């Protein structure tokens, strides 16, 4: 992520718009890049790489930038794969975090996989392998939708 402060993402006055990507090296192979978070939010969980949309960015620009920053990969966003809301409450019931996340199905087009400090690990996995991992809520459904939408494009 760039210079946006993480403090403004805790106890936000409104939902925060974010993007992520189910990145495929080869759509026929079906393996998708799954990463494990090295810090909050979702510390230690497997998920899709991505991050917050910055003011003035389109969703596609944001997902390309975030993936490059977090993984070193160049991608081509192909199609939206649904949406997800992540709402986390603290012990007093106050909303600590509220993200609206728009995941893309994307094609890897270049770059070498180099993780930044936000990520602890990355794996290219088949969707069926996700059930063995501790993942963010809804990850398997998002990856499944990404696969379906890619297949529908032919």
Regions found by a protein language model. Give the residues of each.
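Conserved beta-strand segments that form the floor/walls of ligand-binding pockets within enzyme
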Residues: 18, 47, 103, 124
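Nudix hydrolase/Nudix homology domain
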Residues: 112-154
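A generic structural micro-feature
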Residues: 11-15, 45, 94-100, 119
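Conserved Nudix-box catalytic region and its N-terminal flanking loop in Nudix hydrolases
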Residues: 29-70
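Conserved N-terminal beta-strand and adjoining loop/helix that marks the start
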Residues: 2-32, 83, 105-107
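Short loop segments at secondary-structure junctions
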Residues: 25-29, 38, 107-112, 127-129
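Active-site segment of metal-dependent pyrophosphate-handling enzymes
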Residues: 72-110
């Amino acid at each position: 992520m760039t210079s946006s402060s993480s403090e403004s993402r805790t106890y936000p006055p409104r939902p925060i718009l974010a993007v992520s990507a189910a990145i495929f090296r080869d759509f026929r192979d079906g393996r998708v890049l799954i990463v494990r978070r090295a810090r909050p939010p979702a510390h230690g969980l497997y998920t899709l790489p991505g991050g917050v949309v910055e003011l003035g960015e389109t969703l596609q620009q944001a997902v390309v930038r975030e993936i490059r920053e977090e993984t070193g990969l160049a991608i081509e966003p192909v199609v939206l794969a649904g949406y997800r809301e992540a709402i986390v409450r603290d012990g007093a019931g106050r909303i600590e975090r509220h993200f609206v996340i728009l995941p893309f199905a994307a094609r890897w087009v270049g770059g070498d996989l180099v993780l930044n400090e936000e990520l602890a690990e990355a794996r290219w996995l088949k969707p069926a392998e996700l059930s063995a991992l501790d993942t963010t809520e809804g990850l398997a459904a998002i990856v499944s939708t990404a696969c379906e939408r890619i297949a529908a494009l032919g």
